Amino acid sequence: MKTLYLTAILSVMLLSTVASAQNGAFPKLPHVPGTGKLSDDPKSTQFTFIAAGDNRPSGNAIKQPKILSHILKDSKRFKPTFILWSGDTIAGFRSAGKNMHHKTLIAQYKEFFRQAAKAGVPMFNSPGNHEMDVVNKSKDETVETPDEKMVALYLKEMKYPKDTPPYGAFNYGNSRFIAVDTEEVPPITAVRSEGKTVAKKLKLDPGFVSMQQMELLAADLEANKDKTHIFVFMHHPIKPAKNGSRLNKENADALEALFAKYHNVTYVIAAHEHLYFNATGDSIQPHSKKSPSSDGPTYLVSGGAGAPLDSCPGDAEKNCSSSYHYLVFEVNGDKVDVKVVMVPAKVKKA
């Protein structure tokens, strides 16, 4: 069943891509807005950027963890051109009641943007479950689910143009950067993985990526085969440290197969797990990578920007760290070096 589903998805995306090519144009992913303006430098082959995620406070707090402020200030020493963020920028769904435009949610976004300004460079976010979901309680269970009103609020606060979905892409230098929305509201008929259960019997949503987004993503990858590097950033991981945190399995399998087709997809960066995990390697620090590569992309989980930390599984001691951190990417032509920068223990979360 899994193989048939995966084959069907890839076939539909391939047919859509071929049809677009025959018409002389590929459908484009929309431009993803940042916290500031980024001017592309098409000739640039040497630049640095930062990646991180999961800074959201505990409970329904407005105040951001000190870890976030430290990361945004400390990373300046690497002189990044911009920052990629893999979601959960606010406490979000724990604060969402019947009125999704509650002043607490607005205040949470305002505080995040105030902190983001400390970076001095634009930040680009792929949404997480805390921005997009609500909690529904019944006698039997408490379930987290995506919500249209939360999505609308996210689009408004993140200043997306009207009628634009919360995903997209942008170019810088020799590279393409793609933000995937793993938190789409699924149709009622969608069959999805079982979400993991956390504290107080809250069942988390496993995420969802629509066929429409998958088709646009496939077409965008095809249209950008000439780019030296493609970096993908998203919230739910395709290859997490713990299987219970994985993106909805059918979506994860389809995306992994799609990314493997394009040898210039260099890195896939996710969060959701509050830790660091090098899913592709056997060490904390990722190895240097050249593009194109038939080995497929390097998969990294970077969710240590301030949210309460998760523990690493016992079998991942060599390539997992339950630590606050951020990633530094240095692009030099066809080569990329990544450095994991740990936040000193003296920097307190609160």
Predicted features, each with a name:
Residues 85-86, 90-93, 224-242:
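Short acidic, glycine-rich surface-loop motifs adjacent to enzyme active sites
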